[in-house]
Amino acid sequence: MRKTDAHILVFDSGIGGLGVADCIRRMLPAATLGYVADTAGFPYGAMSDEALVTRVLTVLEQAIARLRPDMVVIACNTASTLALSALRSRHDLPFIGCVPPLKWAASVSATRQIGLLATPATVDRPYLTALMQEHGQGCTLHAHGARHLAGYAEAVFRGETVLVEAVRAELGILGMIPDIDAVALGCTHYGRLLPWLRQAMPRPVAWLDPAEAVARQAARIAITAAATAAPDSLPRAAPCWAQTVFTTGAVPDEATRQAWAAEGFPEWQPLEIASA
């Protein structure tokens, strides 16, 4: 794999990974990107841990067998937390995951009061305690699980209207504690809602989107792999799935297809899942 021809597959339950894909595209403009959206499984937060791991393993095993990428970016906090170890043990290729950027929040907070805006499934998982113990730097964490924000992000992607008042209602305690000065986004979908979140919050805070950090890690691995490639190896042609989004759910309508195209994925193909 060379920096100029890395074949990278981005995975999420929906459109949450598009921010990560955009950052990768800027950092590695010659890389080939494809996208797998497990739309039939959205939202992942509604699944049990066991069901989610089974789902992610099944979808990605079939996608990897079909597409043969050099690297897979798991642009989903929940899937990263639960399934990353199993994926790495089953496949001989790099997997990049994402976790809530609590270390970043702790590093920028002046009040030592930080927020986490995530899905209820993420907020309820015990790994947050371990993250805070390792990276919290003496901060107090105020976590809120928003039930509808991921769906609102999907609606914005489709061109539907989402009201600031609806987003404000999803902020929970984060909008009530005046000392919070940094909020980590614990769901990649939420980056699409940043304009709404800034308007909805009753005071200015730093909104921390992990998309760029995830992309930087992917770029580092791609560049390292390129540096160790044989010096006389030739660049490869882009695979047939370049700029293609694969979805597991219903066939997207024309407006949704156009929205994917506007995000750099003008081609669409179904990803048939035998069982999950």
UniProtKB/Swiss-Prot annotation:
Kindly identify the residues recorded as the active site: 76 (proton donor/acceptor), 187 (proton donor/acceptor)
Q: Name one Pfam family in it.
A: Asp_Glu_race
UniProt keyword annotation of Acyltransferase present: no
* UniProt keyword Nucleus, yes or no: no
The protein's annotated pathway: Cell wall biogenesis; peptidoglycan biosynthesis
Q: Which molecular function terms from Gene Ontology are attached?
A: glutamate racemase activity
- List its EC numbers: 5.1.1.3
Instruction: Extract the PROSITE patterns matched here.
Output: ASP_GLU_RACEMASE_1
Q: Which residues bind substrate?
A: 12-13, 44-45, 77-78, 188-189
Which InterPro entries would you find in this protein's record?
Asp/Glu/hydantoin_racemase, Asp/Glu_race, Asp/Glu_racemase_AS_1, Glu_race
Keywords attached to this Swiss-Prot or TrEMBL record, sorted alphabetically, are: Cell shape, Cell wall biogenesis/degradation, Isomerase, Peptidoglycan synthesis
Which reaction is recorded as catalysed by this protein?
L-glutamate = D-glutamate
What Gene3D superfamilies does this protein map onto?
A: 3.40.50.1860
Q: What class of enzyme is it?
A: isomerase
Which biological process annotations from GO are given for this protein?
Answer: cell wall organization; peptidoglycan biosynthetic process; regulation of cell shape
Q: What function is annotated for this protein?
A: Provides the (R)-glutamate required for cell wall biosynthesis.
The similarity comment for this entry is: Belongs to the aspartate/glutamate racemases family.
Name of the molecule in the record? Glutamate racemase
The gene for this chain is murI
